[in-house]
Regions:
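Rossmann-like dinucleotide/flavin-binding elements
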Residues: 43-74, 116-131, 139-148, 164-222
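Short, conserved active-site loop motifs that form the nucleotide-linked donor/cofactor pocket
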Residues: 101, 113-115, 160-162
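Repeat-solenoid scaffold signature
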Residues: 1, 107-119, 125
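Flavin-dependent oxidoreductase catalytic cores
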Residues: 1-51, 56, 61-72, 80, ...
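Generic structural signal for well-ordered, non-membrane alpha-helical segments
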Residues: 2, 6, 19, 42, ...
Length: 231
Protein backbone atom coordinates (compact mmCIF):
# COMPACT_ATOMS: atom_id res chain seq x y z
CA UNK A 1 0.00 0.00 0.00
CA UNK A 2 2.99 2.30 0.37
CA UNK A 3 3.90 1.90 -3.32
CA UNK A 4 2.21 3.89 -6.07
CA UNK A 5 1.70 1.00 -8.49
CA UNK A 6 1.61 1.35 -12.27
CA UNK A 7 -1.94 0.96 -13.63
CA UNK A 8 -0.75 0.11 -17.19
CA UNK A 9 -2.52 3.05 -18.81
CA UNK A 10 0.44 3.76 -21.17
CA UNK A 11 -0.60 7.41 -21.47
CA UNK A 12 2.22 9.52 -20.08
CA UNK A 13 5.00 7.01 -20.75
CA UNK A 14 4.47 5.10 -24.00
CA UNK A 15 1.87 7.59 -25.22
CA UNK A 16 4.27 10.50 -24.86
CA UNK A 17 7.32 8.77 -26.32
CA UNK A 18 6.15 6.59 -29.20
CA UNK A 19 5.86 8.67 -32.35
CA UNK A 20 5.51 12.05 -30.63
CA UNK A 21 8.79 12.31 -28.69
CA UNK A 22 7.39 14.26 -25.75
CA UNK A 23 8.86 14.12 -22.22
CA UNK A 24 7.76 11.16 -20.13
CA UNK A 25 4.99 11.85 -17.66
CA UNK A 26 2.83 9.64 -15.46
CA UNK A 27 -0.94 9.69 -15.10
CA UNK A 28 -0.81 8.78 -11.42
CA UNK A 29 2.51 10.28 -10.32
CA UNK A 30 2.84 14.04 -10.88
CA UNK A 31 6.40 13.92 -9.50
CA UNK A 32 7.75 12.09 -12.57
CA UNK A 33 10.26 14.40 -14.31
CA UNK A 34 9.44 17.08 -11.77
CA UNK A 35 10.92 15.57 -8.61
CA UNK A 36 9.35 15.52 -5.16
CA UNK A 37 10.91 18.72 -3.87
CA UNK A 38 7.50 19.99 -2.78
CA UNK A 39 7.52 17.42 0.03
CA UNK A 40 10.31 19.39 1.71
CA UNK A 41 8.21 22.56 1.67
CA UNK A 42 6.06 23.60 4.62
CA UNK A 43 3.48 26.35 4.89
CA UNK A 44 4.73 29.26 6.97
CA UNK A 45 1.38 30.14 8.51
CA UNK A 46 -1.89 28.43 9.35
CA UNK A 47 -3.84 27.48 6.24
CA UNK A 48 -7.17 25.67 5.91
CA UNK A 49 -7.85 23.80 2.67
CA UNK A 50 -11.26 22.40 1.74
CA UNK A 51 -11.31 19.83 -1.06
CA UNK A 52 -14.72 18.97 -2.49
CA UNK A 53 -14.77 15.52 -4.09
CA UNK A 54 -13.10 12.33 -2.96
CA UNK A 55 -12.04 10.87 -6.28
CA UNK A 56 -8.41 10.43 -7.25
CA UNK A 57 -7.90 14.13 -8.05
CA UNK A 58 -9.46 15.21 -4.76
CA UNK A 59 -7.48 12.66 -2.77
CA UNK A 60 -4.20 13.67 -4.41
CA UNK A 61 -4.90 17.36 -3.75
CA UNK A 62 -5.93 16.71 -0.14
CA UNK A 63 -2.93 14.50 0.61
CA UNK A 64 -0.49 16.98 -0.93
CA UNK A 65 -1.99 19.91 0.99
CA UNK A 66 -1.84 17.99 4.26
CA UNK A 67 1.73 16.84 3.61
CA UNK A 68 2.98 20.43 3.34
CA UNK A 69 1.31 21.32 6.62
CA UNK A 70 -2.15 22.61 5.77
CA UNK A 71 -5.16 21.67 7.84
CA UNK A 72 -7.16 19.90 5.17
CA UNK A 73 -10.81 18.86 4.92
CA UNK A 74 -12.04 16.52 2.18
CA UNK A 75 -15.79 16.30 1.56
CA UNK A 76 -17.25 13.37 -0.40
CA UNK A 77 -21.00 12.98 -0.90
CA UNK A 78 -20.83 9.21 -1.46
CA UNK A 79 -20.04 6.46 1.03
CA UNK A 80 -16.78 5.47 -0.66
CA UNK A 81 -13.70 7.30 -1.84
CA UNK A 82 -11.93 6.74 -5.16
CA UNK A 83 -14.43 8.21 -7.60
CA UNK A 84 -14.56 7.05 -11.21
CA UNK A 85 -11.29 5.11 -10.99
CA UNK A 86 -12.78 2.88 -8.30
CA UNK A 87 -15.93 2.41 -10.38
CA UNK A 88 -14.13 1.64 -13.66
CA UNK A 89 -11.95 -0.94 -11.90
CA UNK A 90 -15.06 -3.14 -11.58
CA UNK A 91 -14.65 -3.94 -15.29
CA UNK A 92 -12.58 -7.16 -15.26
CA UNK A 93 -9.88 -5.91 -17.66
CA UNK A 94 -9.54 -2.68 -15.67
CA UNK A 95 -9.13 -4.13 -12.18
CA UNK A 96 -5.58 -2.76 -11.84
CA UNK A 97 -7.04 0.74 -11.76
CA UNK A 98 -8.15 0.07 -8.17
CA UNK A 99 -4.50 0.15 -7.07
CA UNK A 100 -4.39 3.92 -7.49
CA UNK A 101 -7.39 4.93 -5.32
CA UNK A 102 -6.41 2.28 -2.78
CA UNK A 103 -2.93 3.82 -2.55
CA UNK A 104 -4.36 7.32 -2.12
CA UNK A 105 -6.84 6.19 0.54
CA UNK A 106 -4.04 4.52 2.49
CA UNK A 107 -1.86 7.61 2.13
CA UNK A 108 -4.69 9.81 3.37
CA UNK A 109 -5.34 7.58 6.38
CA UNK A 110 -1.87 8.33 7.75
CA UNK A 111 -2.25 12.11 7.73
CA UNK A 112 -3.46 13.41 11.08
CA UNK A 113 -4.18 16.87 9.71
CA UNK A 114 -6.46 15.53 6.94
CA UNK A 115 -10.10 15.20 7.96
CA UNK A 116 -12.43 13.26 5.66
CA UNK A 117 -16.21 13.63 5.54
CA UNK A 118 -18.03 10.86 3.65
CA UNK A 119 -21.75 10.69 2.90
CA UNK A 120 -21.65 14.46 3.19
CA UNK A 121 -22.98 17.16 0.87
CA UNK A 122 -20.66 20.13 0.46
CA UNK A 123 -23.16 22.81 1.41
CA UNK A 124 -22.24 26.48 1.62
CA UNK A 125 -22.87 26.36 5.36
CA UNK A 126 -20.52 23.41 5.90
CA UNK A 127 -17.74 24.84 3.76
CA UNK A 128 -17.95 28.24 5.46
CA UNK A 129 -17.86 26.60 8.90
CA UNK A 130 -14.45 25.12 8.05
CA UNK A 131 -13.06 28.63 7.50
CA UNK A 132 -11.17 27.80 4.29
CA UNK A 133 -8.33 29.85 2.88
CA UNK A 134 -8.48 27.81 -0.32
CA UNK A 135 -11.29 25.68 -1.80
CA UNK A 136 -10.43 22.98 -4.33
CA UNK A 137 -13.23 21.80 -6.62
CA UNK A 138 -12.59 18.15 -7.52
CA UNK A 139 -16.17 17.06 -8.18
CA UNK A 140 -15.44 15.47 -11.55
CA UNK A 141 -17.70 15.69 -14.59
CA UNK A 142 -20.84 14.28 -16.13
CA UNK A 143 -20.85 12.28 -19.38
CA UNK A 144 -21.71 14.24 -22.51
CA UNK A 145 -25.04 12.98 -23.83
CA UNK A 146 -25.60 13.35 -27.58
CA UNK A 147 -28.81 15.07 -28.77
CA UNK A 148 -30.72 11.86 -29.46
CA UNK A 149 -34.48 12.13 -29.06
CA UNK A 150 -35.65 10.36 -25.90
CA UNK A 151 -32.15 9.62 -24.59
CA UNK A 152 -32.24 11.97 -21.61
CA UNK A 153 -35.64 10.69 -20.52
CA UNK A 154 -34.79 7.01 -20.80
CA UNK A 155 -31.17 6.62 -19.76
CA UNK A 156 -30.74 4.41 -16.67
CA UNK A 157 -34.49 3.94 -16.44
CA UNK A 158 -35.34 0.78 -14.51
CA UNK A 159 -36.24 -1.99 -16.92
CA UNK A 160 -35.07 0.10 -19.87
CA UNK A 161 -32.47 -0.66 -22.51
CA UNK A 162 -30.38 2.53 -22.33
CA UNK A 163 -27.61 2.57 -19.75
CA UNK A 164 -24.90 5.03 -18.78
CA UNK A 165 -21.38 3.72 -18.20
CA UNK A 166 -21.84 4.18 -14.44
CA UNK A 167 -25.09 2.22 -14.38
CA UNK A 168 -23.58 -0.51 -16.57
CA UNK A 169 -20.66 -0.88 -14.16
CA UNK A 170 -22.94 -1.00 -11.12
CA UNK A 171 -24.77 -3.96 -12.70
CA UNK A 172 -21.74 -5.59 -14.30
CA UNK A 173 -22.07 -8.87 -12.38
CA UNK A 174 -25.60 -9.32 -13.72
CA UNK A 175 -24.56 -9.73 -17.36
CA UNK A 176 -24.37 -13.39 -18.47
CA UNK A 177 -21.13 -14.82 -19.86
CA UNK A 178 -22.83 -15.77 -23.13
CA UNK A 179 -24.71 -12.98 -24.94
CA UNK A 180 -24.98 -14.75 -28.30
CA UNK A 181 -27.77 -13.19 -30.35
CA UNK A 182 -27.90 -10.00 -28.27
CA UNK A 183 -27.15 -6.63 -29.86
CA UNK A 184 -25.23 -3.91 -28.03
CA UNK A 185 -24.86 -0.38 -29.40
CA UNK A 186 -22.12 1.71 -27.79
CA UNK A 187 -22.48 5.47 -28.27
CA UNK A 188 -18.99 6.93 -28.19
CA UNK A 189 -15.82 5.36 -29.54
CA UNK A 190 -13.34 6.87 -27.12
CA UNK A 191 -11.48 5.10 -24.35
CA UNK A 192 -14.56 4.40 -22.22
CA UNK A 193 -16.65 3.25 -25.16
CA UNK A 194 -13.92 0.83 -26.22
CA UNK A 195 -13.75 -0.49 -22.65
CA UNK A 196 -17.43 -1.36 -23.00
CA UNK A 197 -16.77 -3.07 -26.33
CA UNK A 198 -13.97 -5.10 -24.73
CA UNK A 199 -16.42 -6.28 -22.09
CA UNK A 200 -19.29 -7.33 -24.37
CA UNK A 201 -17.48 -8.59 -27.49
CA UNK A 202 -15.84 -11.62 -25.80
CA UNK A 203 -19.31 -12.56 -24.55
CA UNK A 204 -20.31 -13.05 -28.20
CA UNK A 205 -22.66 -10.07 -28.34
CA UNK A 206 -23.14 -8.29 -31.67
CA UNK A 207 -21.50 -4.96 -30.77
CA UNK A 208 -21.72 -1.75 -32.82
CA UNK A 209 -19.97 1.56 -32.11
CA UNK A 210 -21.48 4.94 -33.01
CA UNK A 211 -18.92 7.76 -32.96
CA UNK A 212 -19.37 11.38 -34.13
CA UNK A 213 -15.67 11.78 -34.98
CA UNK A 214 -14.19 10.33 -38.20
CA UNK A 215 -12.05 7.85 -36.22
CA UNK A 216 -12.55 5.75 -33.12
CA UNK A 217 -10.03 5.57 -30.33
CA UNK A 218 -9.05 9.21 -30.76
CA UNK A 219 -6.49 10.16 -28.11
CA UNK A 220 -5.83 6.62 -26.93
CA UNK A 221 -2.18 5.72 -26.46
CA UNK A 222 -0.60 3.68 -29.30
CA UNK A 223 -0.08 0.52 -27.23
CA UNK A 224 -3.70 0.29 -26.07
CA UNK A 225 -4.96 1.24 -29.52
CA UNK A 226 -3.15 -1.69 -31.16
CA UNK A 227 -4.45 -4.10 -28.53
CA UNK A 228 -8.02 -2.86 -28.86
CA UNK A 229 -8.19 -2.74 -32.64
CA UNK A 230 -6.81 -6.28 -33.01
CA UNK A 231 -9.35 -7.70 -30.57
Amino acid sequence: KEIRKCISCNIGCAGNRIGVNRPIRCTINPAVNEGEGYKKLRVKKSCNIVVIGGGTAGLEAACTAAEVGCTTFLIEKKANLGGLAAEISKIPDKKRLSDFPNYLIHRASKLKNLFIFKNTEATIELVESLNPNIIVNATGSNPLLPPIKGLHENIDKEGGKVSSITNMINHITEYPEDLTGKKVVVIGGGAVGLDVVEFFAPRHADVSIVEMMPVIGNGIDPVSKVGTFTM
